[in-house]
Each structure stands twice: as C-alpha cells, then as structure tokens.
Amino acid sequence: MLNIFSLICICLNSVLYSSSFFVAKLPEAYAFLNPIVDVMPVIPVLFFLLAFVWQAAVSFR
C-alpha cells in the first residue's frame, strides 16, 4: 500500500513540476522542430490505443 501511495505522490509531483517544461522554448537553431516537439507527447497514447485496435482485430483472444 505504501508503494502505491509513493508512486501516486511521485506522479503528482512530476506533473506539477513538469508544467514548467511546457512553456520552455527550443533554442533558435531548432525552432523549425517546434511542430514535431508539440506532437511528441501524444505518441505513447497512440501506441496505447493501437493495442486496443489490435486486440479488437484478433477478437480479444
């Protein structure tokens, strides 16, 4: 139980403190990569959804 509580606290703290990363800007030399960097956090969610599509394709065996 303590481990789960600790994990939840760590996750909440990382969410609260990582909000400063969203307002960070790339260096000027990498400014052309801004659209790609904006999409990158969504990629793990797409893999998660792909797992459900795959399981639906094989009838949730």
UniProtKB/Swiss-Prot annotation:
Pfam families: PsbK. Its main location: plastid. Coiled coil: none annotated. Keywords: Chloroplast, Membrane, Photosynthesis, Photosystem II, Plastid, Reaction center, Thylakoid, Transmembrane, Transmembrane helix. It is found in: Plastid, Chloroplast thylakoid membrane. InterPro entries: PSII_PsbK, PSII_PsbK_sf. Residues 1-24 form a propeptide. GO terms for biological process: photosynthesis. The keyword Chloroplast applies. GO terms for cellular component: chloroplast thylakoid membrane; photosystem II reaction center. The chain crosses the membrane at residues 40-60. It is a single-pass membrane protein. Belongs to the PsbK family. PSII is composed of 1 copy each of membrane proteins PsbA, PsbB, PsbC, PsbD, PsbE, PsbF, PsbH, PsbI, PsbJ, PsbK, PsbL, PsbM, PsbT, PsbX, PsbY, PsbZ, Psb30/Ycf12, at least 3 peripheral proteins of the oxygen-evolving complex and a large number of cofactors. It forms dimeric complexes. HAMAP family: PSII_PsbK (MF_00441). One of the components of the core complex of photosystem II (PSII). PSII is a light-driven water:plastoquinone oxidoreductase that uses light energy to abstract electrons from H(2)O, generating O(2) and a proton gradient subsequently used for ATP formation. It consists of a core antenna complex that captures photons, and an electron transfer chain that converts photonic excitation into a charge separation. This is Photosystem II reaction center protein K. It comes from Morus indica.
